[in-house]
Amino acid sequence: MPSKKNTKYLSLLVLFFTFSFGFSQNTSKFKVVLDAGHGGEDPGAIKNGIKEKDIVLDVVLKIGKILEKNNSIEVVYTRKTDVFIGLRERANIANKAKANLFISVHCNGVKSTAARGTETFVMGMSRTDTNLDIAKKENGVIFLEKDYNEKYKGFDPNNPETLLGLKILQEEFLDQSISLASEIETNFVKNNNRFSRGVKQQPIWVLDATVMPGVLIELGFVTHPEEGKYLSSEKGKEEMSESISNAIVSYKNNFFNGVVAERETVENSIPTKVDSNSESNSSDNSNKEKSNKTYYKVQIS
């Protein structure tokens, strides 16, 4: 059992880092890091010539173009061209920039052509096999990097025990991340008539390594015939970019300007969990009914 002296010391240390980080973020401009997933030799999900890396780069550049029109927002990109960027470098870019927000954009892809819908992830732990598969997919890019074992200190995205062993380094930002993720999904549903699979917590390395609120957005499934066409279309990219940009600006107004809008606590905003497998296999009629409402499925355990 730690002594009272050690407990007091640790408490002071935590306060020091909390205040230090808080002041480091208090810049004249709201700084957003936009991260287009995959790139270069890592195409991400592919179906019928549609590549995830191309879609997400286009969407990120469009988001940046919208945000840069706002003089109070500074945009930082992890990549602006078709190049491979390692997960550690992506996190380092965000941390060195002392960003206020980290946005990583991806597309989903599975063997089934029936799965569809958007979903947005925040850092957290989950024991469901479905979500662990997604975590493996997004973390698997690690193996393309040289000396990955040394860089990531034995982190193995294919080992569920490793995933479950990830520590949440940014619990203080969890509420903000969920708030942003919820607004993004709401915008997709209301503004773009998309089917939302919800907001979820998941042990994704790049979110764990960035010391700021952050989300990983899955724009949809390139493996779904209709959704794949929408994701790769100019209309789809424009709509998704606007929905994400609007959510970011709303987040900035709520949190960065010193005025936090009243909202439900994290505990009170978590409804009963919905089985994601049952959603993927539901009928088209059922999906159409669901598409008019956003289902938030923040999985704590």
Region locations from a protein language model:
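Bacterial Sec-dependent N-terminal signal peptides
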Residues: 1-30
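Short linear recognition/processing motifs and adjacent strand/loop elements at protein termini
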Residues: 2, 23-25, 257, 261, ...
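Catalytic-core regions of hydrolytic enzymes
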Residues: 25-155, 170-174, 178-182, 229, ...
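Structural motif
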Residues: 31, 100, 212-214, 295
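Active-site-adjacent mobile loop/cap segments within catalytic or ligand-binding domains
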Residues: 33, 44, 162-259
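Flexible hinge/switch segments at interdomain interfaces of large molecular machines
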Residues: 151-160, 216
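Conserved HRD-motif arginine in the catalytic loop of eukaryotic-like protein kinases
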Residues: 278
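Solvent-exposed beta-strand motifs enriched in subsets of small alpha/beta binding domains
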Residues: 284-301
